[in-house]
Design a protein with these regions (language model features):
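P-loop NTP-binding core
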Residues: 1-241
């Protein structure tokens, strides 16, 4: 969500597609939306296209959201046996790519057909990792999935880097995880972004207030400066291809 809101505030036309059934991004951006117009319908109904489920986000001139739904948990079953199911999202985003400067896809942590759709549709991948030991579980499997997608369905997919989230520089654990992340980055043939997002109350307060971190914590919170620095790094990667 940080990338989508940050770029929208900088004047880019942005579409955020929330594919995580927890819907954290959706909850943080909109108070209410039509439960029949979500990313679930986008993935499971052949006739539903992006404009039918994209919701303008209040407070932004140029940010649209395809919200998540709890019914996303049924996608795996409903798309079982569907020919070329991993291309559904790619085909539908292709139809609106000229309407936006940037399309951001928020995915669940599990490796399923939803994530395969996202990886097949994406040009670039940014991997967020929380500063705890459990976040490293499944990273090797993700690396294998990415390589398989690059080989079979999306050769243009590249990995921009890994973002360390909820970082506390005062703990030995966070320092150890930072060192371990460099080894993880080698698996993906990528880098760890220099800018980290520290663990801060302002992040959760911003979500509860349904504001972006840039708006809510503009009062001087250090995590806002983290976010701006990270956004600048990511922007540079996007511009350089």
């Amino acid at each position: 969500m940080l990338l989508a809101t940050g770029e929208a505030l900088r004047g880019e036309r942005v579409l955020l597609v929330d594919l995580d059934q927890q819907g954290d991004a959706s909850y943080s951006l909109v108070s209410d939306y039509d439960p029949s117009k979500t990313s679930y319908e986008l993935l499971t109904s052949e006739s539903v296209q992006v404009p039918a489920v994209a919701t303008p986000v209040s407070g932004y001139l140029n940010l649209d959201l395809v919200p998540a739904s709890l019914t996303l948990e049924r996608v795996e079953v409903e798309l079982a046996g569907v020919l070329d199911a991993q291309f559904i999202l790619s085909d539908k985003l292709e139809a609106v790519k000229d309407d936006y400067d940037l399309i951001v896809i928020d995915t669940p942590p599990s490796l399923n057909v939803i994530v395969s759709n996202a990886l097949t549709a994406a040009d670039k991948l940014i991997i967020p990792v929380q500063a705890d030991i459990y976040s490293f579980k499944g990273m090797a499997t993700l690396a294998q999935r990415v390589k398989a997608i690059q080989r079979r369905s999306n050769p243009r997919l590249s990995i921009c880097g890994i973002v360390l989230n909820r970082y506390n520089p005062r703990t030995n654990l966070s320092k150890a995880i930072t060192e371990a992340l460099n080894e993880v980055a080698e698996q993906f043939n990528t880098k760890v972004y220099r800018s980290t997002l520290r663990d801060a109350t302002a992040v959760r307060e911003a979500q509860n207030a349904k504001q972006s971190l840039f708006e809510y914590a503009a009062k001087g919170a250090k995590v806002t400066e983290d976010a701006k620095a990270l956004l600048n790094e990511i922007e540079e990667d996007l511009k350089n291809g």
